[in-house]
Amino acid sequence: MNINDFDFDLPEELIAQTPLEKRSESRLLILDPKTEELEDRHFYNIIDELEAGDALVLNNTRVLPARLHGERAETGGHIELLLLKDMGQNRWETLAKPARKMKVGEEVVFGDGRLKAVVVEVLDHGGRIVEFKYDGIFLEILESLGEMPLPPYIHEQLQDQERYQTVFAKENGSAAAPTAGLHYTPELLEKIADKGVKIVELTLHVGLGTFRPVSVDNVDEHQMHSEFYRLTEEAAAQLRAVKASGHKIVASGTTSIRTLETIGSKFDGDIQADSGWTDIFIKPGYEWKVVDAFNTNFHLPKSTLVMLVAAFAGRDFVLDAYQHAIDEKYRFFSFGDAMFVRPKK
């Protein structure tokens, strides 16, 4: 497969720069892989796609305000630090700007000096491992000093940082939001639960690799970034019961999909409690193990996320759906509209 097989022309004005005032009033394009029919709806209509006994799986990760601005202790020069991965023992993998100034032993001071970072390792790809020094609770300090790391295609300042969090976000650790979940409101989730749908949570901490473009022509040569995931025993038991009863497992977003399919691949289609790192790459030809249907946003041309949707619903149908969305002026990417992909069987 060639990367250009997943390309399409997207007018820049369709890239949503701000979230809608009401989360669930975004538009929803229904894709039916069995009939290859499309329906234009609104996100609150997703309840019509769910039946009593189904499970709706949400990713409860919370985005860290992971962009820090500080000064070099030695010279006072400005340094920007982006936190990528918690390595434990107050050490983080980071990206630094300007990186060339950040040699081993370099110290950076943030805010009023409550937080300091010392470079302990320079990585091959240009990242830096830093060790933080602070008094108090690290996450509280980060909340007061850090900024939300918005995707590179969003150029407007976010007025309310909580709009880049889902309403069910609770497990700190992501560098980006699981954007398929941004459309849900507490009221909509309550209606879904009242219908008899089980709402099940898992955790996958989204890394910045989610925005990294595919740099090879041959898709099979692409190496996915790895991300941490966790599914609890209680959640696994709920999902096994749903499967056993013949109902649907509906995933909210590609992060939930990647977690469930990682576990399904690891346990021969069974759903077990598990945690670890996944670099699963779901592309056309993939044999699905767990997920029956899903909602997701509209993704970047030539991205692994478009490939994932194509792996489920078929490349030609998905590209037709994208063209329909472009023609109908749907909003794209993180703050944009959504699609719901019905079961293919």
From Swiss-Prot:
Catalytic activity: 7-aminomethyl-7-carbaguanosine(34) in tRNA + S-adenosyl-L-methionine = epoxyqueuosine(34) in tRNA + adenine + L-methionine + 2 H(+)
Coiled-coil boundaries: none
UniProt-recorded name of the protein: S-adenosylmethionine:tRNA ribosyltransferase-isomerase
Enzyme class name: transferase
EC number: 2.4.99.17
Job of this protein: Transfers and isomerizes the ribose moiety from AdoMet to the 7-aminomethyl group of 7-deazaguanine (preQ1-tRNA) to give epoxyqueuosine (oQ-tRNA).
Subunit details: Monomer.
GO biological process: queuosine biosynthetic process; tRNA wobble guanine modification
Subcellular location: Cytoplasm
One term under GO cellular component: cytoplasm
Similarity-based family: Belongs to the QueA family.
MF (Gene Ontology): S-adenosylmethionine:tRNA ribosyltransferase-isomerase activity
Principal localisation: cytoplasm
